From Swiss-Prot:
InterPro entries, A to Z: P-loop_NTPase (IPR027417), Thymidylate_kin-like_dom (IPR039430), Thymidylate_kin_CS (IPR018095), Thymidylate_kinase (IPR018094)
HAMAP family assigned: Thymidylate_kinase
Stated name of the protein: Thymidylate kinase
Gene3D superfamilies for the chain: P-loop containing nucleotide triphosphate hydrolases
Annotated family: Belongs to the thymidylate kinase family.
Any one of the GO BP annotations: dTTP biosynthetic process
Organism of origin: Thermosynechococcus vestitus (strain NIES-2133 / IAM M-273 / BP-1)
Record field: transmembrane: none
Length: 241
């Protein structure tokens, strides 16, 4: 299985979704499952170290951690275009310093949010031009896309109720309900456009059932990918198409 979204041997999995979808919980559950089911041991046996990069946007690098604080947890008024460019700066650093090196060595990247969130939040939510966002995403990533996008979808009211239980929300969570409805529509549009790489997961159910659905989706994908990975690594072809 050769990825059409990047030329590297590794596997790039992204979790997307609106507020309160449970992405953080599922990131940890997936990492535990990958370890317990032997997938990370298989990668170690192929001398892939580390076998898994568990990361997020914004905030996947030291620079990104500072940008995350500014974007999500400051009281500053940020212009929508400035916000878009700050997310792009975070992503450019993240791809260069974290995501691409991990994929080059043949490992798995599991990322909480990526380019789709920018389209959904800054495009559909804020109303910025989608072509401009696409161009900026292309610049920030160098065209590096995810192999599999797991979209944790649930009604906006349910997700926001979950976030309210955590206390005062971050800058994005504090937006009006109409904003979050537009964001959800953005994810829906992206899922329809990228149906070969997107998998909708019903997040309006208990966390263990969400985890089970994700595991079932990942299992077949991992088997196909790993067979190709072994051939590429054995042949010394980690980076090349």
């Amino acid at each position: 299985m050769h990825s059409a979204t990047h030329p590297y041997a590794g596997l790039f999995i992204v979790l997307e979704g609106g507020e309160g979808a449970g992405k953080t919980t599922q990131m940890g559950a997936i990492a535990t499952w990958l370890e317990n089911s032997g997938w990370l041991a298989k990668l170690r046996s192929c001398h892939v170290d580390p076998p898994l990069l568990l990361t997020r946007e914004p905030g996947g690098t030291p620079l990104g951690q500072g940008l995350r604080q500014l974007l999500l947890h400051s009281d500053l008024a940020i212009d929508p275009l400035a916000e878009l460019l700050l997310y792009a700066a975070d992503r450019a650093q993240h791809v260069a310093m974290g995501i691409r090196p991990q994929l080059q060595r043949g490992g798995i990247v599991l990322c909480d949010r990526y380019t789709a969130s920018t389209v959904a939040y800054q495009g559909y939510g804020r109303g910025l031009d989608l072509q401009i966002i696409q161009h900026i995403n292309q610049m920030a990533t160098g065209g590096l896309g995810a192999d599999l996008v797991l979209w944790l979808d649930l009604p906006v009211a349910v997700g926001l109720a979950r976030t309210q239980q955590r206390g005062r929300g971050d800058r994005l969570e504090q937006n009006a309900v109409a904003f979050h409805e537009r964001v959800r529509q953005g994810f829906l549009a992206l899922a329809q456009q990228g149906s070969d790489r997107w998998q909708r997961i019903d997040a309006d159910q208990p966390p263990d059932q969400v985890t089970q659905a994700i595991q079932e989706c990942l299992a077949a994908h991992l088997h196909r990918w790993f067979e190709t990975l072994k051939q590429r690594l054995t042949g010394g072809d980690r980076d090349l198409p």
